[in-house]
Amino acid sequence: LGADALDPGAIDRVFEAKGRPRDRPLSLGVPDVDAALEYVAPTDREERFMRAFLPGPVTVVLGRRDPVPDALTAGRDRVGIRVPAHEVALAFYREADRPVTATSANRSGEGSARRVEAVSRSIREAAVVLDGGETPGTESTVVDPSLDDPVLREGSEADAIRAWLRG
């Protein structure tokens, strides 16, 4: 579910459409790692990690830069970055020429919609639906490389991520 990730009003509408609690941050979607660097300040190791796993099914939590609003991060000083390995999403991000909220097109607490037909009415009423075909339905692995236990949510490639971070 995408909206302008720098516009607090647009971000609020995403929270409303999803019924998502405002204390649960949204991720910021961009077309590539270089675009992400405008919005986050990774360490050298964190940037190497990004380049190793993005694009891919990973959300990397990093220190945010000033343009990223509190509304997106629930006031936290870190933001999740998504560069999906999905050509329709990447084309949308490139065309938007701005960071976009990166969250699943479902109501909070419901399973991810893998096909456009599974997108709930409340989401359809709040947004334009782009049909990029069926998605794998596997959640991204959420990683904060700065933590001792960096995997915050296990998803695709979790074992490879842990191995890279240990190495």
What are these regions (language model features)?
Residues 1-167:
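Active-site-adjacent structural elements in enzyme catalytic cores
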